[in-house]
């Protein structure tokens, strides 16, 4: 809920994929790991922070997207459980959209006194890769042939993650 390393984490999604693999968008969605965190626990127990402008941004999103990440739910996980669900195999690359995810996840790991989910040098920025590698790239996005962008539910962690993989693997 902000752009600081101490920000509350609402939710996260990870999709393990083989860079040489062939996947449909739906297959990527189906293999995603989704974690919804308990925001109140983070504020109460770890003094994590909330930015007012981020709350205002969330309030402008669709009801469905807010129900997935922003609203309290029955699937909210403790910070400790959520972090463990995000922990990956050693020497696996994590692609993220910018550096914020790494900062906040590493920070909450410090709060929990557990190791980061992966080494700092295993993180990669998907926007930079797309901008450098794809001819149609613009600000970290590119065209994906035979893919309907309308299928992406913007700001839904799993959909955003799957779309990033689609652009990285199949973008032009």
What is the role of each PLM region?
Residues 1, 5-9, 15, 77, ...:
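Metal-dependent nucleotidyl/phosphoryl-transfer cores and adjacent nucleic-acid-binding surfaces
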Residues 1-96:
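Conserved non-catalytic scaffold segment of RNase H-like nuclease domains
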Residues 38-46, 52-56, 124-163:
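Active-site-proximal helix-loop-helix substrate-binding element of RNase H-like nuclease domains
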Residues 81, 85, 103, 107, ...:
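Residue-level signal for well-ordered alpha-helical scaffold segments within enzymatic catalytic domains
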Residues 87, 100-121:
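Substrate-recognition/cap helix-loop segment adjacent to the acidic, metal-dependent catalytic center
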Residues 90-99, 103-104, 141-172:
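Acidic, Mg2+-coordinating catalytic module of metal-dependent nucleases/exonucleases
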Residues 97, 110, 129:
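Short, loop-centered acidic/histidine patches that primarily coordinate divalent metals
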């Amino acid at each position: 809920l902000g752009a600081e390393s101490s920000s509350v984490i609402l939710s996260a999604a990870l999709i393990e994929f083989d860079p040489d693999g062939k996947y449909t968008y739906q297959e990527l969605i189906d293999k995603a790991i989704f974690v919804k965190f308990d925001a109140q626990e983070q504020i109460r127990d770890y003094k994590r922070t909330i930015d007012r402008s981020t709350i205002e941004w969330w309030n402008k999103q669709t009801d469905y997207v807010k129900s997935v990440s922003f609203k309290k739910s029955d699937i909210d996980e403790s910070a400790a459980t959520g972090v463990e669900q995000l922990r990956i195999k050693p020497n696996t690359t994590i692609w993220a959209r910018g550096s914020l995810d790494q900062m906040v996840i590493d920070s909450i790991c410090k709060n929990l006194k557990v190791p980061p989910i992966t080494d700092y040098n295993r993180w990669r920025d998907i926007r930079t890769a797309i901008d450098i590698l794809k001819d149609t790239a613009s600000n970290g996005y590119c065209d994906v042939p035979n893919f309907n962008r309308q299928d992406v539910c913007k700001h839904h962690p799993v959909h955003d993650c799957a779309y990033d993989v689609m652009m990285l693997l199949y973008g032009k």
